[in-house]
Regions:
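Conserved GNAT acetyl-CoA-binding A-motif
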Residues: 121-132
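Conserved acetyl-CoA-binding loop of GNAT-fold acetyltransferases
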Residues: 145-154
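Conserved beta-strand-loop-alpha-helix junction that forms the acyl-donor binding cleft
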Residues: 105, 131-141, 157-163
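Glycine-rich phosphate-binding loop
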Residues: 108
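Terminal substrate-recognition subdomain of acyl/acetyltransferases
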Residues: 161-174
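Residues forming the Rossmann-fold NAD(P)(H) cofactor-binding site
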Residues: 111
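Acetyl-CoA-dependent GNAT
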Residues: 2-105, 114-116, 120, 170-172
Length: 174
Protein backbone atom coordinates (compact mmCIF):
# COMPACT_ATOMS: atom_id res chain seq x y z
CA UNK A 1 0.00 0.00 0.00
CA UNK A 2 1.20 3.50 -0.77
CA UNK A 3 0.08 6.76 0.77
CA UNK A 4 0.34 9.94 -1.28
CA UNK A 5 -0.85 13.52 -0.83
CA UNK A 6 -3.84 14.68 -2.86
CA UNK A 7 -2.65 18.00 -4.25
CA UNK A 8 -4.89 20.56 -5.95
CA UNK A 9 -3.69 21.56 -9.43
CA UNK A 10 -3.76 25.34 -9.94
CA UNK A 11 -6.08 25.57 -6.94
CA UNK A 12 -8.56 23.03 -8.34
CA UNK A 13 -9.13 19.44 -7.30
CA UNK A 14 -8.28 17.08 -10.21
CA UNK A 15 -11.49 15.64 -11.69
CA UNK A 16 -10.59 11.96 -12.23
CA UNK A 17 -9.15 11.58 -8.73
CA UNK A 18 -12.05 13.52 -7.26
CA UNK A 19 -14.45 11.06 -8.91
CA UNK A 20 -12.53 8.17 -7.31
CA UNK A 21 -12.70 9.85 -3.91
CA UNK A 22 -16.43 10.49 -4.28
CA UNK A 23 -16.93 6.79 -5.03
CA UNK A 24 -14.96 5.95 -1.88
CA UNK A 25 -17.12 8.32 0.18
CA UNK A 26 -20.27 6.81 -1.34
CA UNK A 27 -19.40 3.34 -0.06
CA UNK A 28 -19.42 4.74 3.49
CA UNK A 29 -23.06 5.82 3.77
CA UNK A 30 -23.38 4.10 7.19
CA UNK A 31 -20.58 6.27 8.60
CA UNK A 32 -22.00 9.42 7.05
CA UNK A 33 -25.42 8.61 8.53
CA UNK A 34 -23.73 8.71 11.95
CA UNK A 35 -21.67 11.82 11.23
CA UNK A 36 -24.32 13.91 9.50
CA UNK A 37 -21.69 15.34 7.16
CA UNK A 38 -23.90 15.05 4.07
CA UNK A 39 -27.61 15.81 3.62
CA UNK A 40 -28.31 12.37 2.10
CA UNK A 41 -25.60 9.80 2.91
CA UNK A 42 -27.04 7.48 0.26
CA UNK A 43 -26.57 10.08 -2.49
CA UNK A 44 -23.20 11.74 -1.95
CA UNK A 45 -22.24 13.79 -5.01
CA UNK A 46 -18.86 14.68 -6.47
CA UNK A 47 -19.66 18.34 -5.79
CA UNK A 48 -20.34 17.65 -2.10
CA UNK A 49 -17.10 15.70 -1.77
CA UNK A 50 -15.18 18.47 -3.55
CA UNK A 51 -16.57 20.98 -1.05
CA UNK A 52 -15.76 18.70 1.91
CA UNK A 53 -12.17 18.29 0.69
CA UNK A 54 -11.79 22.02 0.03
CA UNK A 55 -13.05 22.71 3.57
CA UNK A 56 -10.49 20.27 4.99
CA UNK A 57 -7.65 21.75 2.93
CA UNK A 58 -8.57 25.30 3.98
CA UNK A 59 -7.00 24.67 7.41
CA UNK A 60 -3.33 25.51 7.78
CA UNK A 61 -1.27 22.32 8.00
CA UNK A 62 -4.01 20.18 6.43
CA UNK A 63 -3.34 17.36 4.00
CA UNK A 64 -5.48 14.76 2.29
CA UNK A 65 -3.58 11.49 1.93
CA UNK A 66 -4.76 8.86 -0.55
CA UNK A 67 -4.10 5.18 0.11
CA UNK A 68 -3.75 2.90 -2.89
CA UNK A 69 -3.31 -0.84 -3.05
CA UNK A 70 -2.50 -2.40 -6.43
CA UNK A 71 -3.34 0.99 -7.99
CA UNK A 72 -6.86 1.06 -6.50
CA UNK A 73 -7.98 3.79 -4.11
CA UNK A 74 -8.79 1.91 -0.89
CA UNK A 75 -8.63 4.68 1.69
CA UNK A 76 -8.13 8.29 2.57
CA UNK A 77 -6.84 10.18 5.59
CA UNK A 78 -7.41 13.86 6.31
CA UNK A 79 -4.67 15.06 8.65
CA UNK A 80 -3.78 18.30 10.34
CA UNK A 81 -0.41 19.21 11.79
CA UNK A 82 -0.61 20.55 14.41
CA UNK A 83 -3.94 19.53 15.91
CA UNK A 84 -6.73 22.09 16.29
CA UNK A 85 -6.31 24.01 19.53
CA UNK A 86 -2.64 23.00 19.85
CA UNK A 87 -1.70 26.55 20.78
CA UNK A 88 -3.07 25.75 24.25
CA UNK A 89 -1.37 22.37 24.59
CA UNK A 90 1.08 20.00 22.94
CA UNK A 91 1.91 20.56 19.29
CA UNK A 92 0.66 17.18 18.11
CA UNK A 93 -0.78 16.18 14.75
CA UNK A 94 -4.37 15.14 14.23
CA UNK A 95 -6.14 12.55 12.11
CA UNK A 96 -9.38 14.29 11.17
CA UNK A 97 -10.77 11.45 9.08
CA UNK A 98 -9.71 7.97 8.10
CA UNK A 99 -12.01 6.48 5.51
CA UNK A 100 -11.67 3.03 3.93
CA UNK A 101 -13.68 1.64 1.05
CA UNK A 102 -16.60 0.02 2.88
CA UNK A 103 -16.71 -2.81 0.35
CA UNK A 104 -13.25 -3.80 1.62
CA UNK A 105 -13.78 -3.43 5.38
CA UNK A 106 -12.05 -6.03 7.58
CA UNK A 107 -9.31 -6.54 4.98
CA UNK A 108 -6.65 -4.68 6.99
CA UNK A 109 -6.72 -1.48 4.95
CA UNK A 110 -7.74 0.74 7.87
CA UNK A 111 -4.94 -0.57 10.06
CA UNK A 112 -2.47 -0.19 7.16
CA UNK A 113 -3.53 3.40 6.45
CA UNK A 114 -3.37 4.31 10.16
CA UNK A 115 0.12 2.80 10.40
CA UNK A 116 1.35 4.69 7.31
CA UNK A 117 -0.03 7.97 8.68
CA UNK A 118 1.66 7.33 12.03
CA UNK A 119 4.96 6.50 10.28
CA UNK A 120 4.70 9.73 8.32
CA UNK A 121 4.23 11.76 11.52
CA UNK A 122 7.04 9.85 13.27
CA UNK A 123 9.39 10.60 10.35
CA UNK A 124 8.46 14.29 10.74
CA UNK A 125 9.63 14.15 14.36
CA UNK A 126 6.21 13.97 15.98
CA UNK A 127 5.97 12.04 19.25
CA UNK A 128 2.20 11.46 19.35
CA UNK A 129 -0.97 11.77 17.27
CA UNK A 130 -4.57 12.52 18.22
CA UNK A 131 -8.00 11.74 16.81
CA UNK A 132 -11.57 12.51 17.84
CA UNK A 133 -14.05 9.64 17.55
CA UNK A 134 -17.77 10.37 17.47
CA UNK A 135 -19.43 8.93 20.56
CA UNK A 136 -22.21 7.45 18.40
CA UNK A 137 -19.65 5.30 16.56
CA UNK A 138 -18.56 2.49 18.92
CA UNK A 139 -17.06 0.48 16.04
CA UNK A 140 -14.63 3.33 15.29
CA UNK A 141 -13.78 3.66 18.98
CA UNK A 142 -12.99 -0.07 19.15
CA UNK A 143 -10.89 0.18 15.97
CA UNK A 144 -8.76 3.05 17.29
CA UNK A 145 -8.30 1.47 20.71
CA UNK A 146 -7.14 -1.74 18.98
CA UNK A 147 -4.53 0.42 17.20
CA UNK A 148 -3.18 1.59 20.58
CA UNK A 149 -5.06 4.88 20.96
CA UNK A 150 -6.26 5.76 24.45
CA UNK A 151 -9.10 8.10 25.38
CA UNK A 152 -7.83 11.36 26.90
CA UNK A 153 -10.92 13.56 27.14
CA UNK A 154 -14.50 14.13 26.07
CA UNK A 155 -15.18 17.04 23.74
CA UNK A 156 -17.50 18.51 21.13
CA UNK A 157 -16.22 18.60 17.58
CA UNK A 158 -15.53 22.05 16.16
CA UNK A 159 -17.60 21.70 13.01
CA UNK A 160 -20.98 20.53 14.30
CA UNK A 161 -20.72 20.30 18.09
CA UNK A 162 -21.08 16.50 18.04
CA UNK A 163 -20.10 14.56 21.17
CA UNK A 164 -16.77 12.82 20.72
CA UNK A 165 -13.88 11.28 22.58
CA UNK A 166 -10.39 12.58 21.87
CA UNK A 167 -7.86 9.75 21.71
CA UNK A 168 -4.08 9.88 21.64
CA UNK A 169 -1.29 7.52 20.71
CA UNK A 170 2.37 7.96 21.55
CA UNK A 171 4.57 7.29 18.54
CA UNK A 172 7.55 5.22 19.65
CA UNK A 173 10.85 5.67 17.84
CA UNK A 174 11.55 3.38 14.91
Amino acid sequence: MILQPFVPVDGALPGPVLTEIAALYSTNHAFFELSGDFPDPNRITVEQVAQALADELAHEGAEILLARSAGRLVGLAAVLDPAPGSADGPQEPWIGLLLVDATAHRAGHGRAVATLVEERFRAAGRSAVQIAVLDNNPAASAFWQAQGYTPVRRAKDRERGRACTVMRKALADG
